[in-house]
């Protein structure tokens, strides 16, 4: 979608609608909308940076978990650390389905089951992939809004 042709008010409404759609799909919870509202107190770039950092960190953690599970001897303590990091990040941004997928991985880690860890990790990757594209779109939309607001000042 070409955001350049839309006025800022329409862009803001589109952003609110997109967040609502993600909530209806169950990909995010109310906390995601709350994170968006925090830019009022934390500056216009807060939400853009939050999404960018979340996606980058989540990607790295998933890759680290893939490496860990592919080892001949799985370091379940390391898997646990990665799982908690990803679950915490997902919870903080309101990515509830990704957070829930981490809960299943945590159980597999506690059971020290490589097979269950692989299944749970596949679920995590799937949830991340479901979330990535909509968050990328929200990121681009928010970037356009922020750049317009910055050019007004």
Task: For every predicted segment, state its role.
Residues 1-153:
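Two-component system phosphorelay core
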